[in-house]
Amino acid sequence: MVYYPYNLKDVVAASNQSKFNVISTFAGGGGSSTGYRLAGGKVLCINEFVQEARNTYSENYPDTPILPDDIKEIGGKELMDAAGVSVGEIDILDGSPPCSAFSVAGSLARGGVKTESVNLFGETYIREEVRGKHSDGWGSTKNYSDGKKVENIEDLFFEFLRVAKDMQPKTIVAENVKGLTMGEAKEYFNKITNTFEEIGYDVSAKVLNSASFGVPQTRQRVIFIGVRQDVTAKVGLSFMNISSVFPDEDKKFVTVGEAFEGIENDQEEVDMLVEKMAKSSHWKTVKLMPDDPEKVLTGMDYHPKGHHFNLKRCSRFKPAPTVTATSAPVHFLEKRKLTLKETRRVMSLPDDFTLTGKWEQRSERMGRMVPPLMMKAVAEAVYENILKPYKENTND
């Protein structure tokens, strides 16, 4: 399958169609916003708490109003005022609220935090015990490379839905970690879906793999689609049929080799990454990994007891493994992590997408993003199956 590189001018051209409007919360550096724009949407304003994420967003979309407040400190009115809309006029309220019930290949043991790995359905997750209290992630904090901390992250999804109740958007699209649907986290998952219904929305959730939508990376995330109940009725969908709104998944994947075609890396960055790897705790394991492997390799292939389980090496014949906020995979030929240009490609970002801050902050910013091509597919499905027929039936 061919990967088609694109630039910000292509994003602007698609967004100028103005098929639907969006307000985005927890917008990060703009991954999901890029996807909505590619689908023909107009992003009216965003909310983002982390300064360096806002800097990145502004560099790429300077005309989009940004509310910098903690979402706990604002309501739907502030967002609607910034967007210039009234209650019920927003087509899509978007959000990726942090929710660490189980973080895939998450944090390592460090001061004040004990961790244990848990294998669920073939994937390794991390349970945290914070200051002696077993929490499964509830009540913990999320740290960012610029020093920001988000407290009580288990509350943030419900803060997002509180804002949704204020605004009454036609649809709600939320993204979260796959682990939210597993094990003990299911109770929390059910609480979320019940809250959707309590504020007047029919909802369905599905785990999607970004590789199924042209993203050269296997990144699994749960996507919630909520539809205001009067909209559901107007377009002829029943509660049980909301699940039919999700986009079809393509069985053909874009490989790393295809995605990296035409990339010209900065040699100074490559040298820095090679040197950094040679000094890292992963170096002995990386040296054991053969160059140009047929399949994606993991540290656990060489350390069955679980050491280096979050270390992975790309195969040019497969999509890249998941890029996280703390770790990019190893290049398939060179013994180093991916460069920023390579990471842009495996995240399906525009080639000229600007990243701000130090190298570590730039890499982290991409690792926290929603891949634009996956969100484009979700947005197109929501538009074609819900928003377009609703507008045709109501002249809205």
Predicted regions and their residues:
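Conserved active-site and SAM-binding loop architecture
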Residues: 1-396
